[in-house]
Structure formats: C-alpha cells, structure tokens
Amino acid sequence: MRLTQGAFSFLPDLTDEQIVKQIQYAISKNWALNVEWTDDPHPRNAYWDLWGLPLFGIKDPAAVMFEINACRKAKPACYVKVNAFDNSRGVESCCLSFIVQRPTSNEPGFQLIRSEVDSRNIRYTIQSYASTRPEGERY
C-alpha cells in the first residue's frame, strides 16, 4: 500500500527534473526548504528526522538537490521528503511538502487494529506491517 503524505502523493513518483521545478517554485516564493527522512510509514507520523539544516535563502535548486541526493544515498531504504516553509509573517508554516523517495522494497501496507473499550465501543487504528520490525530494519 502506497504511503500518501504531502502534495503529489497520489501521482507517480516525481522525476528529478520535476523535483527541481517544484524547488524552483518554492525559491521563487522565497520559502525556506528542508529535507526530512523516516522509516516509520504511519500516515499520521508528522515527526520525520531532519536531514542537515534547513536551507534558508537558497537561490539555486542544485543546493537542495545535493542535500536530497546525499539523504537518498545515506538512507536508501527510507522515505525522503522536501518541505517548503513561508516565514514572511514570522511563523514557519509549511506551504509545500512532497515525497522524493520511497523505500527500495515494496511498501508492505497497513493492518487494521480493533480495540474494544468501555461500553462495548470499538476503536480502530492502523499499524504498518513494516513497523513490527525495529527502526532501521523496516525495509
């Protein structure tokens, strides 16, 4: 099952040329960029690990692509995404986020977990099959 987080997640994976165009768009808006990675595929996982430092005042997409490729090389079995932030109002609000790499192996999908709670109510949650393995060994 394909993880869907951020823009373009229902489309085929972006090529490097398409990624550069999105980075150029973010640069044209004076947005700060950063690269993040994770091996925890839960759809509500908002706490990805930051790769390097945020890229403020970048004028050339090559600098961002360098960081993306370094992260891809170091973390080939992880998800990698790019975030663009607008700090024009003094608040770092995410304006654009998209996945630039998925694990090299198949994404195993999610299991539905049912829990009976008070008054016979049922609560549902999902858990990735990949998260049953320890961090760093999921893909």
From Swiss-Prot:
- Gene Ontology terms: biological process: reductive pentose-phosphate cycle
Question: What are the protein's GO molecular function terms?
Answer: ribulose-bisphosphate carboxylase activity
SUPFAM superfamilies named in the record? RuBisCO, small subunit (SSF55239)
Pfam families attached to this UniProt entry: RuBisCO_small
Domain of life of the organism encoding this protein: Eukaryota
**Keywords of this entry:** Calvin cycle, Carbon dioxide fixation, Chloroplast, Photorespiration, Photosynthesis, Plastid
On whether Plastid is a keyword of this UniProt record, the answer is yes
Q: One GO CC term of this entry?
A: chloroplast
Q: Where in the cell is it found?
A: Plastid, Chloroplast
Give the PANTHER family listed for this entry.
RIBULOSE BISPHOSPHATE CARBOXYLASE SMALL CHAIN 1, CHLOROPLASTIC (PTHR31262), RIBULOSE BISPHOSPHATE CARBOXYLASE SMALL SUBUNIT (PTHR31262:SF23)
The extra comment attached to this record reads:
In this alga, in contrast to plants, the small subunit is encoded in the chloroplast. The basic functional RuBisCO is composed of a large chain homodimer in a 'head-to-tail' conformation. In form I RuBisCO this homodimer is arranged in a barrel-like tetramer with the small subunits forming a tetrameric 'cap' on each end of the 'barrel'.
Function, as annotated, reads:
RuBisCO catalyzes two reactions: the carboxylation of D-ribulose 1,5-bisphosphate, the primary event in carbon dioxide fixation, as well as the oxidative fragmentation of the pentose substrate in the photorespiration process. Both reactions occur simultaneously and in competition at the same active site. Although the small subunit is not catalytic it is essential for maximal activity.
Question: What does the annotation say about its assembly with partners?
Answer: Heterohexadecamer of 8 large and 8 small subunits.
- Family to which the UniProt record says this protein belongs: Belongs to the RuBisCO small chain family.
Q: What is this protein called?
A: Ribulose bisphosphate carboxylase small subunit
